[in-house]
């Protein structure tokens, strides 16, 4: 039925075809992902106090908030681009930074953004804030989804940690971001 040369030839063909397949998650790129998120987290920790100071000093307006929102948008866009350029991570639950470390950092970022922006609508000082949200929301949602691609299942813990803070995103109109987070 099958001669030895045919079996050998078929085996070589199968090996050649199989060697072309790339393993989807071959390396742990958590360190690169964590570095990207640390940069984003640092940016958010600079932008948030500025926005909160504008509110506290009663100098919040479209002209003072606009540049801060642009800075937020740029920070998330850069993180999205950097995450997209990073190989999908095999991840790790034991080697630092772990999958949970990444999720905790991103959750911190999201909680800080949601709580920082939560006082803008009630203040009434920026009537154009919903328009700013319409611009920023898809950017933040895209970064969130890209994180979940580059670090698979990373949003599971973020979703749980955002259980309370999601109310602020809902009140501010961040529907795409909430959807990306699984709400």
Predicted regions, residues:
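A taxonomically broad motif for mature regions of secreted/extracellular
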Residues: 20-183
């Amino acid at each position: 039925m099958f001669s030895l040369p045919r079996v050998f030839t078929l085996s070589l063909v199968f090996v050649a075809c199989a060697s072309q397949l790339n393993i989807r998650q071959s390396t742990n790129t958590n360190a690169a992902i964590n570095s990207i998120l640390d940069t984003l987290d640092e940016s958010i920790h600079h932008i948030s106090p500025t926005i909160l100071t504008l509110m506290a000093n009663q100098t919040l307006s479209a002209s003072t908030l606009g540049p801060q929102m642009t800075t937020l948008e740029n920070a998330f866009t850069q993180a999205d681009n950097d995450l997209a350029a990073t190989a999908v991570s095999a991840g790790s639950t034991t080697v630092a930074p772990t999958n949970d470390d990444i999720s905790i950092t991103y959750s911190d970022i999201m909680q800080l953004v949601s709580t920082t922006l939560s006082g803008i609508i009630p203040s009434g000082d920026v009537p154009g804030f919903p328009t700013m949200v319409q611009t920023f929301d898809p950017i933040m949602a895209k970064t969130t989804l890209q994180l979940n691609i580059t670090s698979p299942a990373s949003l599971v813990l973020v979703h749980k940690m955002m259980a309370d803070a999601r109310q602020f995103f809902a009140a501010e109109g961040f529907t795409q971001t909430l959807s990306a987070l699984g709400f």
